[in-house]
């Protein structure tokens, strides 16, 4: 049996036209970072999550860097992180000047 790892079929059948129109607006505007569409998304996301603000990021790495900076983590700090993660986790930590400290995961220690 082969199970596809990811499928957007359900979303496309429901809101495909809306997604295509939004993508075309972004492509035509040339504003891939920032711009009206991003501001609209951030405002809607803040509303859905019942927060005052929302900041979107272009990647998980940038999101981690932003989170670390918001906590004033930097040079001289150590950040404990899982050794069972994508390399971008450690990259984000070193990008702010901190040192990643890797821990192993074990069911008997949880």
Range-by-range predicted roles:
Residues 1-70, 74, 96:
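Conserved PLP-binding active-site segment in aminotransferase class I/II-type PLP enzymes
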